Design a protein with these regions (language model features):
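A detector of single, family-specific signature residues
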Residues: 1-162
Length: 162
């Protein structure tokens, strides 16, 4: 079994190395050959999505909404779409949180701020959604990951009106 796993890993790594999109996506933090290859296979054509939000919805990473009148309540993620891709993005988010690299500092700080308010598991899923948006932009704009382009919302949220 270990030999078969090694062969499969080698094939995935070879695909990621040969595919220019997958190679570019592996420059993002937490994204290795398996996640990049799976993302390319799951999405196929990035032009199907006009915005990163559409891609995040396709992957089931956006919260479901229950609205009534002017009251808007966000719930758990929808879990629509490819569950394995969603799982890979969540695992990549955990990798980012554990990383001490300066390239991940802004993403970690943003996620930890959410964790203080909502809990670590919700923060990890939010980071996975953010990572999906980053991968979308990298693919769409044909660029490699640049930590300086990440603009986290680190300022404190304004107090809510009662």
């Amino acid at each position: 079994l270990n030999a078969q796993i090694a062969v499969a890993d080698a094939r995935i790594a070879a695909f990621a190395k040969d595919d220019p999109i997958a190679t570019r996506l592996t420059t993002a933090p937490g994204v290795g050959p398996v996640t990049a290859s799976a993302f390319v296979a799951a999405i196929d054509d990035i032009t199907r999505f006009r915005t990163a939000h559409e891609l995040e919805a396709y992957l089931g990473l956006i919260p479901c909404e229950r609205s009534s009148g002017e009251k808007r309540q966000l719930g758990h993620i929808t879990k629509a779409g490819n569950g394995r891709m969603r799982w890979l993005l969540v695992e990549a988010a955990w990798t980012i949180l554990r990383s001490k690299s300066p390239d991940t500092a802004a993403l970690r700080a943003w996620s930890l701020q959410i964790a203080q308010r909502r809990g670590k598991r919700i923060a990890v899923v939010a980071l996975a959604r953010r990572l999906a948006g980053i991968l979308y932009a990298m693919w769409r704009d044909d660029v490699v990951y640049d930590a300086h382009r990440i603009r986290p919302r680190l300022q404190a949220a304004p107090p809510r009106a009662a």
